[in-house]
C-alpha cells in the first residue's frame, strides 16, 4: 500500500494550484494524499465550483475514493485508482476556468490505456486563468516537443460572470518523453494583436488595438466579433513569436475600465517579458514543471520565479523522485532537473 502524502494547502501561493498539481500527480503515481487548509487565506476559503469540478473529474477518470469533496471544504483525502482513457464531459456550473480543470486531468491521460477526449463547460475568458488560445498556441507546441500530443479546441466562449463556454481536448498516450531545452527565446519573428468582443461596441476593440500598435510593431491586427449571447465580454491578447518559442499574453476587459487602460496593462506585461532575455514568461513557467519532471530532464529560463512556480516545484518533488535546481545568472533564473 502506497504511503499517504500530507500537504498543507496554505503553503506557497496558498491557492488552488497546490490542489490541482496534487490531483494530477496522485493520478499519475497512484499515491494517495491528504490536503488541509485549502485556500485558507482567500476571501472565499475552501473549494469553489471550479476546484470541486477538478476533484470530481479526477476521481471519475481514475476511480478514486474521495473524502471532503464539497463546496467550501478545506480538507480533502484523495485515494486514486487506475486511470482510464475515454470520453469525458464535466460542467463547472459557473464561470470557473475550463482550462484549469483540463490541466488538472490531462497529465494523467498521457498515461492512459488509449486516446481520450475531455470536454469542460464553464468560463473561458477569466482574468486569473489561461485562455484556450494560450494552451493551443503556446503550451501544446512545447508539449509536442517533449513527446506529449494533445489538441485543444475552443467550442464556445464564456466570459465572467456568466460562463457558458465550452473547451475540449483530445489527447493520446505518450510513447516516450524527450528533453525540452529553452535557454533562449531567440530573435522576435513577429507580433500579433487580437481582440475578442461579445456584446461590446467595436470601437472598444479599435481603441485597444491602437494602444497596442502605439507600442509595438504588429504584423497582424485581428478583431473578432463573437455572438452577443456569448458575452458581454472583451479580451485583448498579444502574441510574441520568437525563433525558439511563442508566448501569448492577455488581459480581460472590465466594466468601467477604459479600452486604453485595459490595453496599457497588456503593453506593460509584454514589455516586462521583452526586457529580460529569458525564454519563458511567468505563467508558462509553472506549466512546464510537471511535463519536464515526467521527462526526467530539461531546462528553461524565466525572468523571475513566481510563487506559483516555486509551489508547483515543491508539490512535484513530494510525488516524484526528481529535484529541481534554480540558478540566477545575470538577472535570469535557469530552472532545470538536477
Swiss-Prot record:
The active site is at 308 (tele-amp-histidine intermediate). Keywords: ATP-binding, Cytoplasm, Ligase, Nucleotide-binding. It catalyses: a 3'-end 3'-phospho-ribonucleotide-RNA + ATP = a 3'-end 2',3'-cyclophospho-ribonucleotide-RNA + AMP + diphosphate. SUPFAM superfamilies: EPT/RTPC-like (SSF55205), RNA 3'-terminal phosphate cyclase, RPTC, insert domain (SSF52913). Its EC number is 6.5.1.4. One of its GO terms (molecular function) is ATP binding. GO terms for biological process: RNA processing. Coiled coil: none annotated. Signal peptide: none annotated. One of its GO terms (cellular component) is cytoplasm. ATP binds at residues 103, 283-287. Catalyzes the conversion of 3'-phosphate to a 2',3'-cyclic phosphodiester at the end of RNA. The mechanism of action of the enzyme occurs in 3 steps: (A) adenylation of the enzyme by ATP; (B) transfer of adenylate to an RNA-N3'P to produce RNA-N3'PP5'A; (C) and attack of the adjacent 2'-hydroxyl on the 3'-phosphorus in the diester linkage to produce the cyclic end product. The biological role of this enzyme is unknown but it is likely to function in some aspects of cellular RNA processing. HAMAP family: RTC (MF_00200). This is RNA 3'-terminal phosphate cyclase. It comes from Shigella boydii serotype 4 (strain Sb227).
Amino acid at each position: 500500500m502506497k504511503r499517504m502524502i500530507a500537504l498543507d494547502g496554505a503553503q506557497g501561493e496558498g491557492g488552488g494550484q497546490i490542489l490541482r498539481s496534487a490531483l494530477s500527480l496522485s493520478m499519475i503515481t497512484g499515491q494517495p494524499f491528504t490536503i488541509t487548509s485549502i485556500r485558507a487565506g482567500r476571501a472565499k476559503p475552501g473549494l469553489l465550483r471550479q476546484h470541486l469540478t477538478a476533484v470530481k473529474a479526477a476521481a471519475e477518470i481514475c476511480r478514486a475514493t474521495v473524502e471532503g469533496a464539497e463546496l467550501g471544504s478545506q480538507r480533502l483525502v484523495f485515494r486514486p485508482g487506475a486511470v482510464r482513457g475515454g470520453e469525458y464531459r464535466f460542467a463547472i456550473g459557473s464561470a470557473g476556468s475550463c482550462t484549469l480543470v483540463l490541466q488538472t486531468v490531462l497529465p494523467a491521460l498521457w498515461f492512459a490505456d488509449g486516446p481520450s477526449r475531455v470536454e469542460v463547460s464553464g468560463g473561458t475568458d477569466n482574468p486569473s486563468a489561461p485562455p484556450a488560445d494560450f494552451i493551443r498556441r503556446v503550451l501544446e507546441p512545447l508539449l509536442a516537443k517533449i513527446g506529449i500530443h494533445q489538441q485543444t479546441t475552443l467550442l464556445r466562449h464564456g466570459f465572467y460572470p456568466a460562463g457558458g463556454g465550452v473547451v475540449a481536448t483530445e489527447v493520446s498516450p505518450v510513447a516516450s518523453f524527450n528533453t525540452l531545452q529553452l535557454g533562449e527565446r531567440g530573435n522576435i519573428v513577429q507580433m500579433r494583436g487580437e481582440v475578442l468582443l461579445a456584446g461590446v461596441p467595436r470601437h472598444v476593440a479599435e481603441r485597444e488595438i491602437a494602444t497596442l500598435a502605439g507600442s509595438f510593431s504588429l504584423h497582424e491586427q485581428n478583431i473578432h466579433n463573437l455572438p452577443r449571447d456569448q458575452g458581454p465580454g472583451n479580451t485583448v491578447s498579444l502574441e510574441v513569436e520568437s525563433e525558439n518559442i511563442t508566448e501569448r499574453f492577455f488581459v480581460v476587459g472590465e466594466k468601467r475600465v477604459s479600452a486604453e487602460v485595459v490595453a496599457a496593462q497588456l503593453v506593460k506585461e509584454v514589455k516586462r517579458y521583452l526586457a529580460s532575455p529569458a525564454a519563458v514568461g511567468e505563467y508558462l513557467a509553472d506549466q512546464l514543471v510537471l511535463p519536464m519532471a515526467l521527462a526526467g530532464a530539461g531546462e528553461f529560463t524565466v525572468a523571475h520565479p513566481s510563487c506559483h512556480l516555486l509551489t508547483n516545484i515543491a508539490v512535484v518533488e513530494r510525488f516524484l523522485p526528481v529535484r529541481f535546481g534554480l540558478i540566477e545568472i545575470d538577472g535570469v533564473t535557469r530552472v532545470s532537473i538536477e
